[in-house]
């Protein structure tokens, strides 16, 4: 029997919106839709045209520079980083800057072991280390990362994501291509409509009935944080 989402379902909003796009599967496996439906390619990512063209350019070149991706929560920084690696066929190591990324020795040992080895299966020119939420790492960890970027430049690329780029030390800025995930005002309606359509597509796939005005309310409430919708 199909579930129907109605206007009453968004009361209280904080609870119902969380339920709208977060689903526990019938097989008792907890599976967040944000992961299940995460875009696998840059083409699938909902981005301003100018930003998407930058990443498409990297794909045409067949490699990426060191990147610093900056923008608010849920705008697609991590998704873009993973999509780039997926399309380039790059091995990727993810380190969470809010967790293990705060410990100097952990970062040093993990990165060195990974970056100093050559992949036997990947056809990409470089391996990738993704430092997610890099603005939550400590200053000494950032100084270490600066050194690692230089030490392993022939074999490895680094992608840093952050909400606040002012919390990233200048030496890392200068060693990366900095890309701001900001949507020009003129493109905001287009981006919101694209995500509105994406949500409806997901609900249709999951066979969940819905009212369009409820989906629109979700997008309007949390835009541009798409992860929360």
Regions found by a protein language model. Give the residues of each.
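Conserved phosphate-handling catalytic cores of large alpha/beta enzymes
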Residues: 198-203
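The conserved phosphate-sensing helix
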Residues: 222-229
């Amino acid at each position: 029997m199909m579930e129907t989402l109605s206007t009453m379902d968004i009361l209280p909003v904080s609870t119902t919106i969380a339920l709208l796009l977060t689903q526990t599967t019938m097989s008792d496996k907890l599976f967040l839709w944000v992961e299940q439906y995460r875009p696998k390619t840059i083409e699938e990512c909902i981005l301003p045209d100018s930003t998407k063209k930058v990443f498409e350019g990297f794909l045409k070149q067949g490699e990426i520079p060191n990147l610093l991706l900056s923008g608010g929560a849920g705008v697609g920084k991590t998704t873009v980083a993973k999509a780039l690696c997926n399309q380039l066929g790059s091995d990727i190591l993810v380190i969470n800057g809010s967790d293990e990324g705060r410990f100097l020795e952990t970062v040093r040992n993990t990165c060195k072991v990974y970056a100093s080895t050559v992949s036997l299966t990947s056809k990409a020119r470089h391996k990738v280390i993704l430092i997610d939420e890099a603005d939550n790492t400590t200053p000494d960890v950032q100084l270490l990362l600066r050194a690692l970027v230089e030490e392993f430049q022939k074999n490895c690329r680094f992608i840093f994501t952050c909400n606040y780029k002012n919390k990233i030390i200048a030496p890392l800025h200068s060693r990366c291509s900095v890309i701001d995930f900001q949507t020009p005002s003129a493109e905001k309606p287009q981006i919101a409509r694209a995500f509105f359509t994406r949500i409806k597509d997901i609900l249709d796939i999951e066979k969940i009935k819905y009212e369009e005005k409820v989906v629109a309310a979700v997008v309007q409430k949390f835009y541009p944080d798409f992860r929360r919708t």
